[in-house]
Design a protein with these regions (language model features):
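Alpha/beta-hydrolase superfamily serine-hydrolase fold, recognizing
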Residues: 2-329
Length: 329
């Protein structure tokens, strides 16, 4: 055999070995895939409407990286305060449970604090797969408990009026926490005690997977979407057989809401998002006679469209969000 043939075989063999090791790594653990997805959500948040953002900055005091006691990591929150005491909007960021950060909420939180006169609490939580379900829910509870116990340290927070919302994965976490507050039997299954049954004024879901059980039955032909769903679910629930996990059904908000659920704002998009899940929750809440404001579009908008304020649809969403918060304060 010629020398060049031996070299070529060595290179091919080496590449095959590397590919085999990578393939095995993706089969035995969600971590490689979770790392790649996490990178998709990394990077500095882009300000999409600078003029209005800068105007809002003049009306809002921002304090970043405050800590709340937690048994988990990433236990920090940012506080966006208008000039006077205000109701609270607790916001939970998205990122597929494996990525994202509260820093990405800066434009939304600043403008919302100014325009709706609410104090926005933007929280972080430890990401999957390092922290698995329902730890993220527990961290929301830890933050709420901390704010209640230290109310005198935050005199500008009107903790008698609390909204809770989120985007993407954060919306599921937020609305599940609201379900805990309004369904005592459900709260017991999660070993949580309702803390804000009277204080909870409303919930907001931006492109949230609020009926998670649907993903177990979807037959998407999109390879990336299949990879994304499999990786996220495996990372969050801790099992490769996540489709048959009892926790998947438990985390499906639409299956556990009751007539005691608070007024809710729901929006979603068609592309790479969870519009059918949002529609399922709208249908359920409407049947329960819970006030619900929904915003869906025929246009092919992308997941998390609502934060791109250059889009007219995002501006409509923002205007309706402010109106919702003002109505139910």
């Amino acid at each position: 055999m010629e020398m060049w043939q031996k070299v070529l075989l060595s290179i091919v063999g080496g590449l095959f070995t590397i590919l085999l090791v990578v393939w095995i790594a993706f089969q035995v653990s969600p971590r490689p895939g979770a790392f790649l997805i996490n990178r998709l959500f990394a990077g500095k948040a882009e300000i999409t409407e600078p003029t209005k953002f800068q105007a809002a900055q003049q009306q809002v005091v921002v304090t970043k990286d405050l800590a709340y006691p937690s048994t988990h990591q990433e236990n920090q929150f940012d506080l966006y305060l208008p000039k006077a005491k205000a109701p609270v909007l607790l916001w939970i960021h998205g990122g597929g449970y494996v990525g994202g950060d509260k820093a990405g909420m800066v434009e939304f939180a600043t403008r919302t604090a100014a325009d709706a006169h609410v104090a926005v609490v933007a929280m972080n939580y430890q990401l999957a797969p390092d922290s698995q379900y329902p730890n993220q829910l527990q961290q929301v509870d830890e933050l709420v408990h901390y704010l209640q116990r230290h109310a005198t340290d935050f005199p500008q927070l009107d903790l008698t009026k609390i909204f809770i919302g989120g985007d993407s994965a954060g919306a599921q976490i937020a609305l599940q926490y609201a379900t805990v507050q309004t369904n005592p039997d459900y709260a017991k299954t999660l070993n949580l005690t309702p803390r804000i049954t009277k204080e909870l004024q409303g919930t907001l879901s931006y492109c949230g997977p609020v009926d998670l059980q649907q993903v177990a039955h979807e037959q998407s032909q999109d390879r990336f979407l299949k990879f994304f769903v499999k990786t996220v679910a495996w990372s969050l629930l801790g099992t490769k057989d996540w489709q048959h996990s009892a926790q998947l059904q438990q985390a499906s908000v639409a299956q556990h809401v009751t007539a005691s659920f608070p007024p809710t704002f729901i929006t979603d998009a068609q592309n790479f998002s969870f519009q059918s899940q949002g529609e399922a929750l709208v249908q359920k809440l409407t049947a329960l006679q819970v006030p619900v404001t929904s915003l869906f579009f025929q246009e092919a908008l992308n997941h998390e469209y609502q934060f791109d304020y250059a889009l007219p649809e995002a501006q409509t969403c923002y205007q309706q969000t402010i109106a919702f918060l003002k109505e139910y304060q």
